[in-house]
Amino acid sequence: MPRLTLTGTNIDAPDANALADFYRRLLGWTTRAEEPGWVIIQAADGGGGRLSFQTESRYVRPVWPAGPGDQQMMMHLEIAVDDLEASVAHAVAQGATLAGFQPQEDVRVCLDPAGHPFCLFLQ
């Protein structure tokens, strides 16, 4: 089998730079590369993977949880935390919103500024 290497995850947004800036502040990461409509961020030490963001002119904000006919989420990020409530407060201070529906006690679903859900969970 040929060697295949996953190098990151690309997230569509109406404004790649704005969404990359949100996740950069949320995670404490740095910008690795930036071009008009495209940004890569990663941990300052180079570990933890990478997230790429691209501007999509026809971006449709997902609805979570989705109902019939709603734009569904395509993926979500799982972010381990050591203090759930402090991490939620940090996420909200950076521009996230707490989702109205919370399916588990030890997980908090938040929405980034472009509407993508992400989960904060105790590890």
Predicted regions and their residues:
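Conserved active-site tyrosine of GNAT-family acetyltransferases
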Residues: 23-24, 91, 115
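A generic "binding-loop/recognition-motif" signal
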Residues: 15, 37, 84
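Vicinal oxygen chelate
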Residues: 2-7, 29-76, 88-112, 123
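Short, low-order "capping/linker" segments at domain edges
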Residues: 117-123
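Short N-terminal helix-initiation segments at or just after the protein's N-terminus
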Residues: 14-28, 60-61
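Short, conserved charged micro-motifs
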Residues: 18, 84-89
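N-terminal beta-strand motif that seeds the catalytic metal site of vicinal oxygen chelate
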Residues: 1-21, 74-81, 121
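Conserved Rossmann-like nucleotide-cofactor binding loop
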Residues: 82, 116
